[in-house]
């Protein structure tokens, strides 16, 4: 079973993923976890980190199709591992997946036809061309925006922040983008 948790930055996805994994452990179900993007992954991990640090341009200046390719490539590289776990009958829990790509990249375009074209393109690229596994369950953690705002205004620390090398994540730094992403998800 492939379970995906999606949501805005700071929505509590990692907390919920850990609770789901504990539940599986208590039930004796072998489970695996991945967080996307995988900053330690060769090629795509470092490119995504550079993008999120702002080294490739401002959040509204880098073509969302190119950014979508980076995030999709990371998942395509992980697809064989996901299939291996799933084929073995294990539960797989993911913190972000394809719909994060749709949400964040489409939010960079005006609402309407251009967003819809990009949405279709990302879904076709990831599930069609790359053939990555489709989730059995995909949950969007729709928390009040004030919660996200508060979480993103706090200092965020931990090993999972190493990719920033002291910089701010350009997606997290833009509350306007986060609002638009929420609109795309909904």
Residue ranges and their predicted role:
Residues 3-5:
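Hydrophobic anchor at the beta1->P-loop junction of P-loop NTPases
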Residues 10:
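Walker A (P-loop) phosphate-binding loop of P-loop NTPases
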Residues 13:
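Conserved lysine of the Walker
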Residues 16:
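Hydrophobic positions on the alpha1 helix immediately C-terminal to the Walker A/P-loop
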Residues 19, 43-50, 143, 147, ...:
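Generic alpha-helical secondary structure signal
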Residues 20, 24-25:
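Hydrophobic alpha-helical packing residues
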Residues 29-133:
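ATP-dependent small-molecule kinase phosphotransfer cores
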Residues 101-183:
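A glycine- and Lys/Arg-enriched "phosphate-lid" helix/loop adjacent to the NTP-binding pocket
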């Amino acid at each position: 079973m492939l379970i995906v948790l999606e949501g805005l930055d700071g929505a509590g996805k990692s907390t919920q993923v850990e609770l789901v994994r504990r539940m599986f452990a208590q039930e004796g179900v072998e489970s695996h976890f991945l967080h996307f993007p995988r900053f330690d992954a060769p090629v795509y991990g470092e490119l995504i980190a550079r993008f999120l640090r702002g080294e490739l341009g401002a959040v509204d200046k880098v073509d969302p199709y190119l950014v979508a390719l980076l995030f999709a490539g990371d998942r395509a590289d992980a697809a064989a591992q996901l299939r291996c776990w799933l084929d073995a009958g294990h539960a797989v829990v993911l913190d972000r997946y394809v719909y994060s790509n749709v949400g964040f990249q489409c939010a960079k375009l005006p609402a309407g036809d251009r967003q819809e074209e990009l949405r279709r393109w990302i879904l076709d690229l990831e599930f069609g061309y790359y053939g990555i596994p489709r989730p059995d369950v995909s949950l969007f953690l729709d928390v009040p925006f004030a919660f996200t705002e508060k979480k993103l205004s706090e200092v965020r620390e931990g090993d999972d922040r190493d990719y920033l090398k002291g910089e701010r994540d350009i997606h997290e730094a833009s509350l306007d983008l986060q609002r638009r992403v929420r609109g795309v998800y909904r």
